[in-house]
């Protein structure tokens, strides 16, 4: 990674922001801490890391306390923080209760991002797969993880996520 950052700085646009990105940081706080230590290592070798990205492919039952802890740890780095991928799987045949839990989780993630990541460190949230996955999809086949259903109708998760994003203003 040290060499990758060195070459990106040398040959890339001087204004580019360079991120290190990983997944499951909200599931494993030790992994999150390890990534933060890795950033420190890269920087100890003379290369600047502008930001940290987290891929959050979570479920309606994700551990909310760990999500909050992850954002707190990432914020403490002083780096730009981006949720580079976010989806919340509600299962193959979700009930109305499951869909409400999904909506609540999308909102929770946006609210915790706004609560713990200072405005100057926020680099955004990218939703991964806006619509639910088709049964033959290569990503979460048949899951109901999107903000829209397969008929492109907004789900409760759409409004809840939007409400959560309002917390960042």
Where in the sequence are the language-model features?
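An active-site-proximal structural segment forming one wall of the substrate-binding cleft
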Residues: 1-11, 34-45, 104-116, 120
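A generic structural signal for short
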Residues: 26-27, 58-59, 98
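Extended low-complexity acidic/polar segments
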Residues: 3-12, 41-46, 51, 58-59, ...
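Aromatic- and acid-rich polysaccharide-binding/catalytic face
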Residues: 10-11, 15-22, 35-62, 67-92
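Aromatic-rich peripheral "rim/lid" segments of glycoside hydrolase catalytic domains that contact
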Residues: 65-169
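Aromatic-lined carbohydrate-recognition surfaces of secreted/lumenal glycan-active proteins
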Residues: 1-32, 82-85, 124-130
């Amino acid at each position: 990674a040290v060499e990758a950052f060195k070459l990106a700085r040398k040959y890339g646009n001087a204004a580019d922001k360079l991120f290190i990105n990983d997944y499951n940081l909200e599931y494993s706080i030790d992994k999150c801490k390890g990534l933060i230590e890795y950033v420190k290592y890269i920087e100890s070798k003379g290369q600047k890391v502008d930001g940290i990205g987290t891929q959050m492919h979570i479920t309606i039952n994700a551990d909310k306390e760990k999500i909050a802890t992850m954002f707190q740890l990432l914020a403490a780095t002083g780096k730009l923080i981006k949720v580079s991928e976010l989806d919340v799987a509600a299962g193959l045949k979700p009930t109305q209760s499951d869909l409400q839990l999904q909506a609540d989780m999308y909102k929770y993630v946006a609210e915790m991002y706004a609560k713990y990541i200072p405005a100057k460190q926020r680099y955004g949230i990218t939703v991964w797969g806006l619509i639910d996955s088709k049964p033959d999809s290569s990503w979460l086949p048949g899951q109901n993880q999107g903000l829209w259903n397969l008929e492109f109708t907004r789900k409760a998760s759409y409004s809840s996520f939007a409400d959560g994003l309002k917390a960042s203003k």
